[in-house]
């Protein structure tokens, strides 16, 4: 049975892969029994390793700061990508749908603190580059698809 996790899901998790079991994580508490509460900018994804076939993030990645200084310097976006890698099983898929540069939607919301480009996932988290490894990224993804849907960059990565 396929299991999927939707990050920053609000009250209803997305399920684009038609998984049998769907879970969510949101900063707001008590949304539904299948939705865990966590601030993913500073907390781990509250599920075990290798648990999901799919992890999705709709309109979420842009809200996770790249770096925070509380109480010490942390690369919170890189830490989140490590967490996504950790909870995905081998060959699991991560789907990100996020407003991205050069579109105004990437900048206009003051809570958009992580500006994504076509190169962000390709060069920093996918083979053969994995440039984020110098900032602590320990995973390894393969970029399997990337395209634009309006102002949103739609990216699919496979855990290798």
Across the structure, where does each feature detected by a protein language model lie?
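A short glycine-rich, Lys/Arg-flanked "PGG" loop and its adjoining helix->strand segment in the class I
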Residues: 73-90
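Core SAM-dependent methyltransferase catalytic element
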Residues: 141-160
């Amino acid at each position: 049975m396929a299991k999927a996790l939707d990050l920053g899901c609000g009250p209803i998790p997305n399920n684009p892969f038609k998984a049998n079991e769907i879970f969510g994580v949101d900063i707001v508490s008590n949304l539904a029994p299948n939705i865990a509460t966590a601030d993913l900018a500073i907390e781990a994804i509250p599920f075990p390793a290798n648990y999901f076939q799919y992890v999705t993030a709709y309109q979420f990645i842009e809200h996770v700061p790249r770096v925070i200084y509380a109480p010490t310097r942390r690369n919170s976006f890189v830490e989140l990508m490590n967490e996504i890698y950790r909870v995905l099983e081998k060959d699991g898929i991560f789907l990100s749908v996020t407003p991205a540069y050069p579109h105004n939607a990437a900048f206009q919301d003051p809570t958009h603190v992580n500006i994504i480009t076509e190169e962000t996932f390709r060069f920093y988290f996918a083979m053969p580059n994995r440039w984020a490894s110098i900032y602590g990224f320990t995973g390894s993804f393969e970029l399997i698809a990337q395209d634009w849907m309006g102002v949103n960059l739609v990216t699919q990565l496979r855990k290798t």
